[in-house]
């Protein structure tokens, strides 16, 4: 059974474009959104809709980190997950007033749905739930700064891997080749339905997204000024790299609550006392810039975002 057609804004969260902060903002403003005829629908117990992304990954695909983290590798597990998410969304939609639009957001829409077939599965699932028309919003960040910020996040999470030396690495291309990303999504949802936005928007990502939504009028609720994921100075990153290498068990993902707590305390202290930014070595930065920066500026021009 489907619900009456209702508009949906699908936020395809690209890497290091404030998705976590945006999701927290939308979740905090549910009452305000309801008064505007909209609702933010995260997964139960989450801030985002990664469960919906996991539903749409090809059944034979076991490569995806999201599937491994959620324990969804066997075909019967995947099919059961799809049914569970469908029922959860149906219940959430049934609780909304008729005609209210919904906002769905996840970084995994971008990271995990890497083929037109997977994006098509998402489109079909939304249609089966009575969601439409669909407006897709994708924020795009300058690729070199994106990768430098990503490396800082990787180190803070306990990761020991360096940034790929080759900017043509498939993972780097996935998150830095913005033209290819837009082409995948527009090939499924249509060019007019997919809107690119430059990150960071001058008024804040929350206000920028709200301004794109039909029927939503300002003034908008204020956004938090504090950054939830600030960068670190080079010496602070070097300290964390040393800890990751010498004490690989001392990570934010440790099964021990005491270890996780101590790492959070250290991270908080560094965020307040050593906030800054990481820069790649000059030669590596030049290779990344030569491959992606010019194409990014051209894309901004084509999209009218320069």
Regions found by a protein language model. Name each.
Residues 2-306:
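Anion-recognition interface
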């Amino acid at each position: 059974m489907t619900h009456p057609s209702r508009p949906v804004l699908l936020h395809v969260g690209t890497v290091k474009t404030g998705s976590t902060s945006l999701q927290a903002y939308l979740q905090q403003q549910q009452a305000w959104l309801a008064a505007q005829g909209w609702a933010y629908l995260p997964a139960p117990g989450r801030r985002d809709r990664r469960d919906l992304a996991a539903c749409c990954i090809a059944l034979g695909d076991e490569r995806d980190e999201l599937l491994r983290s959620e324990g969804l590798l066997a075909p019967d597990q995947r099919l059961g997950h799809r049914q569970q998410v469908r029922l959860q969304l149906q219940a959430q939609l049934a609780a909304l007033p008729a005609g209210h639009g919904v906002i769905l957001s996840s970084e995994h829409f971008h990271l995990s749905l890497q083929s037109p077939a997977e994006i098509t599965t998402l489109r079909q699932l939304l249609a089966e739930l009575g969601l439409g028309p669909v407006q897709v919003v994708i924020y795009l960040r300058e690729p070199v700064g994106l990768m430098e910020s990503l490396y800082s996040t990787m180190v803070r999470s306990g990761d020991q891997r360096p940034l790929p030396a080759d900017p043509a690495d498939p993972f780097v291309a996935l998150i830095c080749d913005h033209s290819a990303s837009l082409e995948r999504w527009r090939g499924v949802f249509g060019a007019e339905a997919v809107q690119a936005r430059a990150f960071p928007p001058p008024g804040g990502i929350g206000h920028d997204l709200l301004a794109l939504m039909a029927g939503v009028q300002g003034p908008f609720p204020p956004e938090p000024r504090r950054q939830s994921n600030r960068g670190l100075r080079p010496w602070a990153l070097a300290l964390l790299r040393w800890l990751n290498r010498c004490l690989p068990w001392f990570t934010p993902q440790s099964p021990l609550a005491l270890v996780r707590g101590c790492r959070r305390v250290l991270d908080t202290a560094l965020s307040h006392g050593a906030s800054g930014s990481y820069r790649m070595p000059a030669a590596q930065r030049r290779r990344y810039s030569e491959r992606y920066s010019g194409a990014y500026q051209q894309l901004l021009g084509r999209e009218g975002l320069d």
